[in-house]
């Protein structure tokens, strides 16, 4: 009887609530319905805050400014000479290098929500954001400080990520960010590392084998499959899940072990100036899973809203985030990924969406 009254009083709301109950909204990569997110986060965050962490933790960003004429000159020179048959899908797409000032907002989120971070490193190719004044807390690191000369310049994120452990003075424990990943709420250090140094492994519910069976063809999937194959061969451990598209807690010593064990495999793809289907994705797959196998990482939960910043759905995601901000139910993080140029000129749209969200 109560349902009938509700239906006749406001049929549109009744139908909306009925559909939401039957088909819950899922915006994250762990198959958690929107109305259950905050319950899980509240309990997780309480547990993650119980034991203090007394070791230093750094943050590492990789960043590029595609509007820099000198960078464009280098990019165009090597783009014209590359064999397009051997580069991965979207590897030459300008969207991979587009700058919408995401770093300004992502860096601001780290400073605001992760105040316990010791130092922030921004890895670039002879660039520095014009709005940034580096200091002891925020340092800009050039590729030449990490990567051997014969592999430079490189426009391959997998090559850059393979050398993160060579950042001068980097802490043993660090968190790797792409500049399109944003911390959405205050988080304790325990969200990323246990007090005994074990790293969080933010595992997705997605399946590598399912994506492959569907015909997905990207350098990221190829690198994950190749990495999983190597680990399965050496440790008899089958891996079928990628990580959530968010920040990645890492340990410098595990990079060193990975290089010791797989130096030949790593060296093989370092000459690839653009991403190919023969790369390994060390920072975002190989090393996190090697860390798990070695017992220094454990599966953990990060509720991250992941969406294509160029798609029509982007505005809906930002609206959901704005509503969650008002209700105090924001996820741990979100990723406004810019992965192809089907939308011809999204620059102002993406910049406006970010500006509107962070100005609220």
Curated annotation (Swiss-Prot):
One of its GO terms (biological process) is polysaccharide biosynthetic process. Transmembrane segments: none annotated. Pfam families: Stealth_CR1, Stealth_CR2. Its EC number is 2.7.-.-. GO terms for molecular function: transferase activity, transferring phosphorus-containing groups. Keywords: Exopolysaccharide synthesis, Transferase. Belongs to the stealth family. InterPro entries: Stealth (IPR047141), Stealth_CR1 (IPR031358), Stealth_CR2 (IPR021520). It is an enzyme of class 2 (transferase). This is Capsular polysaccharide phosphotransferase LcbA. Stealth proteins are part of a protein family that is conserved from bacteria to higher eukaryotes. Family members were first identified in microbes as proteins that help pathogens to elude the host innate immune system. Microbial stealth proteins are involved in the biosynthesis of exopolysaccharides. Stealth proteins are predicted to function as hexose-1-phosphoryltransferases. Part of a group II capsule biosynthesis locus.
